[in-house]
Amino acid sequence: MKQICSIVLLGAAVVSLVSAAGSDSEISFEYHRYEELRKALVSVWLQCPTIARIYTIGESFEGRELLVLEMSDNPGTHEPGEPEFKYIANMHGNEAVGRELLIYLAQYLCNQYQQGNETIIDLIHSTRIHLMPSMNPDGFEKAASQPGEIKDWFVGRSNAQGVDLNRNFPDLDRIIYTNEREGGANNHLLQNMKKAVDENTKLAPETKAVIHWIMEIPFVLSANLHGGDVVANYPYDETRTGSTHEYSASPDDVIFKSLAKAFSIYNPVMSDPQRPPCRKHDDDSSFKDGITNGGAWYSVPGGMQDFNYLSSNCFEITLELSCDKFPNEDTLKTYWEQNRNSLVNYIEQVHRGVKGYVRDLQGNPIFNATISVEGIDHDITTAKDGDYWRLLRQGNYKVAASAPGYLTVIKKVAVPHSPATRVDFELESLMERKEEEREELMDWWKMMSETLNF
């Protein structure tokens, strides 16, 4: 990851933004082309420099930076015990509403933080938030360059190479479905990730950059913002049998449905049971309460949503936010008002389930320890500081921590709706246990020798 110095990023333009940031902090409800997007993010950073940071995870095929605005009380650092959250928008370049909403969200969080909104202050102090307004800046520029207000349904969807980025990720669904039948790992399905990604010539540069990002930061929760319908979509996206439409539950189907509803319930259009389909012949039969299982709607191989879940600890859903992919500019404020509360509430879901640390008996963190939940065939692993976050719905669970060379520890946990329950584990190494057993045996032998006068 490369942090962007604003002076290098925008040159002389920064000077004018410095003076404007204090007097005119509102971002107007309009579309932001690439240069305008950069300026908008820098404006947020200038207004809230203590809680904001701009960085890039790489470049698009045409050389545009894949920009991220981070918001945290300690930007630039993973704080042990603090969960990481991300929003990604504009993966399809012609699906533009999500791109603008993340710009508005950044400004909103900054404004509310400065105005003393306790909910937002607590959220930023307890969460490291990453906002990527555009994963496909090349596609957006192509879509936005079309004349007139009505944009073509497909122009700009793919990246500059013609690659559909939401069909371009390694297809881990096929691996997990094989493992379900024949036995095998249920998480982190790509070994030697960096090499496998770098050597895969079929992956677009935008896809590679996001994969490395997912592998570098221990994200817990994410959402991928799209357009073309109005629904919150959850894994699995790809069907088990190859059927076009088939409910494809993941092991975490219960919490995924709850996460999707956490977004849809605050969006009055998405949650409206009387909402007509976006188009006359659309099949919305799988939509209920504004949510749908991905496979039940239509099967998507190589999607980013399932890749997050199967390659890392990150749970991701896909948010379809508008019937029109590139609606008229005068509707953007309405879309913001419809989605503002949903966007904030969904971030708060990162503080559900159980969290804590896995350490050895000397207090040293155990990296890559496995956290398992009885009855859920999907494990997560600890980060470098031994910290972990396991999203769960309210209920009673048996949670286990294990690691090679250590004895497994199992704990019973009562999990409320929120906040997350703190559950720490101390694991005893097998070497220590063997040493204890050897010492106990020697003590017993000594006692027996003295008793029998050997």
From Swiss-Prot:
Binding note for cofactor: Binds 1 zinc ion per subunit.
Active site: 320
Gene Ontology, cellular component aspect: extracellular space; transport vesicle membrane
Source taxon at top rank: Eukaryota
Enzyme class: hydrolase
Principal cellular location given in the protein's record: membrane
GO MF: metallocarboxypeptidase activity; zinc ion binding
Similarity comment: Belongs to the peptidase M14 family.
Record-given protein name: Carboxypeptidase E
Organism: Lophius americanus
Protein's gene: cpe
